[in-house]
């Protein structure tokens, strides 16, 4: 029930799986085929009173979905992916009544960690033409600053009494922005991330990343993870003295990133993909979806200081020309959206990759002693050092002798509760060894 008229409405979808079509009072207002991606749809003018908002959500992979108006085969989430394609809503759904011109958000970028100088990029929606009068202030400032800005325009200013964001001291600041009829509050941290030779630098100082990969998946809740479970995961990481988590293999929930901001947990955020073939990456529709979902991920999470790495398409066929061209396209798109962070992807073609040379960081997935053939008479743990040495040698010789490296995946899987005194594969004993 809407209590008043409004010239516009915006339907905000946190994330769905795998496709969804939305109607308002029988009229279609939006469609998404990008799982785990936050989406927004304009509804047009809204009258006071009752309305029927309907959603058809489908996690079929094949053409059966076209019967229900869901398009052709699912392009970006395929049956062979090694995690389940849950159906339904993963995150929040909300309908907002807004004015003809609204402030969508303000992107905050650190310019100088010594002075607290930041760049504010103002983004409006609806009628965005011309200048917009804004009032803004940082943290608990009493007085507002004023300016007239156009859509996409950037202002530079200094945050008073600023403190840097670091894993040890995750200091956060707020920016409150008002227009004539709208208001947004952005939370951000002042910090920089860069590389210096083989090192990753946070605020100009080397940082050594120690952490785990993490999925949004639970036997009871699926991909709709409650806040308490997110918090428990971060507590466990903290107890293990970790400072880094890789969100795999899709854009992360904003609630989780909020917690990481507060915990001081550094984050690798990547767009959806897993083992994608050269044929897929040569498909123009697939390329368009990958670029769009990656751009949306960056826009959604750009103000989170915890995010230091953007990534895409886990374990794609990076040894092929389509893989290289896909990498070129994604890196270009990410740098257009956000030139301040590092870009990578998790590579499993560790002896023939040609795409990692485009990245800021070389990242690789290896499973010596678990996946693949095993030398006779060699214990699985003993396979790790020579495999590591061979991988590093290839990348240093063929990609870069002077880029940071991340072991993005390594180890082996175990099935909870499966035991064997002989420590056979998939047992907890084999995994622990």
Per-region residue spans from a language model:
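Accessory beta-strand-rich segments of carbohydrate-active enzymes
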Residues: 1-102, 128, 251, 265-268
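Short strand-turn-strand beta-turns centered on an Asx-Gly dipeptide
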Residues: 23-29, 139-140, 180-181, 203
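Short hydrophobic alpha-helix segments
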Residues: 30-33, 146, 186, 210
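A short, polar/charged loop-to-alpha-helix boundary motif
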Residues: 35-46, 196, 218-225, 275
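Extended acidic/polar, glycine-enriched regions
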Residues: 46-50, 121-196
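Surface beta-strand/loop "capping" patches
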Residues: 97-128
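N-terminal carbohydrate-binding accessory modules
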Residues: 106-110, 164, 176-239, 258, ...
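Substrate-binding/catalytic cleft of secreted carbohydrate-active enzymes
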Residues: 234-237, 244-433
